[in-house]
Amino acid sequence: MRLILSLPVLVVVLSMVLEGPAPAQAAGEISSTFERIPDKLKEFGNTLEDKARAAIESIKKSDIPAKTRNWFSEAFKKVKEHLKTAFS
């Protein structure tokens, strides 16, 4: 008889323990999380800034902008010549 009564009590106690802290107890953790948000945002912004600067520098050092500019100017010249011959 005692075993039958102790098993439901054990289940209830385990469910209470595994449930975690009550909302009133967790309030301190939430406030500390909100206090850390500006620091995390600043860290994220600095990381993003560093990565953006590195990407811009690598683009500046590569020859992709010059090749793109040359390709567009050649394509524009071809279209211009084609239109001249078509409407002349």
Swiss-Prot record:
UniProt note on tissues of expression: Expressed in the liver.
Protein known as: Apolipoprotein C-I
GO biological process, one term: negative regulation of lipid catabolic process
Keyword line: Lipid transport, Secreted, Signal, Transport, VLDL
Naturally occurring in which organism (per UniProt): Canis lupus familiaris (Dog)
Family: Belongs to the apolipoprotein C1 family.
Major location category of this protein: secreted
GO MF, one example: phospholipase inhibitor activity
UniProt key word Signal: yes
Record bears the keyword Membrane: no
Signal peptide: 1-26
Subcellular location(s) per record: Secreted
GO cellular component term, pick one: very-low-density lipoprotein particle
InterPro entries: ApoC-1_sf, ApoC-I
Function summary: Inhibitor of lipoprotein binding to the low density lipoprotein (LDL) receptor, LDL receptor-related protein, and very low density lipoprotein (VLDL) receptor. Associates with high density lipoproteins (HDL) and the triacylglycerol-rich lipoproteins in the plasma and makes up about 10% of the protein of the VLDL and 2% of that of HDL. Appears to interfere directly with fatty acid uptake and is also the major plasma inhibitor of cholesteryl ester transfer protein (CETP). Binds free fatty acids and reduces their intracellular esterification.
Superkingdom: Eukaryota
Pfam families the UniProt entry points to: ApoC-I
